[in-house]
């Protein structure tokens, strides 16, 4: 069995815990790879075990950090590796255990006492090409000029769903429903469901409300005059500028995010995390 280790790069405690996990697994006789960016911030790992995240080929990834660390893994890895998230971040909605539970969790993982939680992702096509990472949380199409609204139409399966003047629009997965989409007035969505939430950001018309559509849908977003540049953000991690005539289509991705879980509990766990964090 081979493990990969990825840590939050700007928190010393996360890097030190990553080394303890690395040492524990090596002493236990397992092959371990370490993300190069983790190594660059704590060069105590054996250099022969260090590879870029894009080249990981492992059975499990141990992520020591927050949601941003997990999103970095999801954007850079080429396969859907199961991730055990250890919360060393601010929110930690995607993580499974707290730091003091790390080695108990590893023991359960090694004993096979876990299950895999699969989450849908969305895929974005710009002018027909899949040139950006799949989103685990959301795509946000934003005004490219601060202080200026954008005028957009969005279609679901070819039918006009809404026309908005707003700061932009969010297309979210159930996993992302506790993030940016929630701030835009979207609902909390049970992560076991597969669907899209479409949420306009600060729309002028009060009648423009978030909507929920099936995950089988194709969503097309069409900019309207006055023509201004747009910014596409994927999970708040990837950014690209779009010209006003860019064709934007969003579908369910064939890929999944996969998480190691020890509990099947959804309620009250997720609502409690929302209240606790905010």
UniProtKB/Swiss-Prot annotation:
Localization per record: Cytoplasm
Keywords: ATP-binding, Cytoplasm, Kinase, NAD, NADP, Nucleotide-binding, Transferase
Single GO MF annotation: metal ion binding
UniProt-annotated binding residues for NAD(+): 67-68, 72, 137-138, 148, 165, 167, 178-183, 237
One GO cellular component term: cytoplasm
Documented EC number(s): 2.7.1.23
Needed co-factor(s): a divalent metal cation
Pfam families reported in the protein's UniProt record: NAD_kinase, NAD_kinase_C
Active site residues of this protein: 67 (proton acceptor)
InterPro entries to which the protein is assigned, alphabetical: ATP-NAD_kinase_N, ATP-NAD_kinase_PpnK-typ_C, NAD/diacylglycerol_kinase_sf, NADK
Catalytic activity: NAD(+) + ATP = ADP + NADP(+) + H(+)
Chief localisation class: cytoplasm
Broad EC category: transferase
Coiled-coil region list: none
Keyword Nucleotide-binding recorded: yes
GO BP of this protein: NAD metabolic process; NADP biosynthetic process
Cross-referenced PANTHER family: BIFUNCTIONAL NADP PHOSPHATASE_NAD KINASE (PTHR20275:SF43), NAD KINASE (PTHR20275)
Family to which this protein belongs: Belongs to the NAD kinase family.
Its biological purpose: Involved in the regulation of the intracellular balance of NAD and NADP, and is a key enzyme in the biosynthesis of NADP. Catalyzes specifically the phosphorylation on 2'-hydroxyl of the adenosine moiety of NAD to yield NADP.
HAMAP family for this protein: NAD_kinase (MF_00361)
UniProt-recorded name of the protein: NAD kinase
Recorded name of the encoding gene: nadK
